[in-house]
Design a protein with these regions (language model features):
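Non-catalytic interface/linker regions that flank or bridge core catalytic/transmembrane domains
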Residues: 1-78, 82-83
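Short alpha-helical scaffolding segments that buttress acidic/His motifs in well-ordered protein cores
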Residues: 57-61, 71-75, 95, 112-116, ...
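Proline-centered turn/helix-capping motifs that create local helix->coil transitions or kinks
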Residues: 62-69, 122, 160-168
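Alpha-helical phosphate/pyrophosphate-handling elements in metalloenzyme active cores
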Residues: 81-112, 151, 185-190
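His-Asp-centered metal-binding catalytic motifs of divalent-metal-dependent phosphohydrolases/nucleases
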Residues: 91, 109-135, 152, 168-181
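Signal-transmission/dimerization alpha-helices at domain junctions
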Residues: 97-101, 124, 155-159
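Histidine/acidic-rich helix-loop-helix segments that form or flank divalent-metal centers
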Residues: 116, 156-196
Length: 196
């Protein structure tokens, strides 16, 4: 399967960087806050309310569809606190910008952004010292960390309103084109396009 759709959508910048930058800043903050709330819910075993996160992703997508420069400039800003959340927001912004560049539909781009944002949701219940460790992990620790994919897929599969494309992104985000990834060692075209 090709990366570009058969009939790509072409997007033109509708705003300047200056016009888009301040709006993109608010969208980024909203996205980070909604992700934080969702991760707290996961951590404490509460029901997941995906609507707020989807709304925030849609706001980011609309900003990037108008002009991706604002969101891309914001990626360059660093925050010592909340690195992980900003990393996921940045990854989501890059996925949305790539979807725009490749000409995907707005629905596909929204799924790309949501999948990238939630890509590590399965780590919410792992010990933070394990996730932040600078030491080499033991085989047992590696196995524990790798289970986050299955945990995320199980959680999101039972969450209403999460598209199959989003779950595919999360299920296959650690698969490598050469088959060296995990959890299923998928190769090449066996990896869904949106997870590549």
């Amino acid at each position: 399967m090709e990366f570009r759709p058969a009939k790509p959508t072409f997007y033109e910048d509708r705003t300047t960087l200056e016009e888009e930058y301040s709006g993109a800043h608010g969208v980024r903050r909203e996205l980070r806050e909604s992700l934080s709330e969702l991760l707290e819910d996961v951590k404490y075993g509460k029901a997941i309310h995906i609507v707020a996160v989807k709304t925030a992703v849609r706001g980011m997508m609309e900003s990037i569809l108008r002009n991706p420069d604002g969101a891309m400039w914001l990626r360059l800003m660093k925050d010592k606190n909340g690195y992980t959340h900003y990393h996921h927001v940045d990854t989501s912004a890059l996925a949305v910008a790539m979807g725009r560049h490749l000409g995907f539909s707005s629905g596909e781009i929204s799924n790309l952004g949501l999948g990238a944002l939630l890509s590590n949701i399965g780590t919410a219940n792992l010990p933070s010292d394990l996730l932040m460790s600078s030491n080499q992990l033991s085989e047992e620790e590696i196995s524990l960390v790798r289970r986050h994919v299955e945990a995320a897929v199980a959680l999101l599969t039972k969450t209403p309103g999460v598209a199959k494309q989003v779950i595919d992104i999360i299920a296959c985000r650690h698969e490598w084109f050469d088959g060296g990834g995990y959890p299923n060692r998928l190769q090449g075209p066996a990896i869904p396009v949106f997870a590549r």
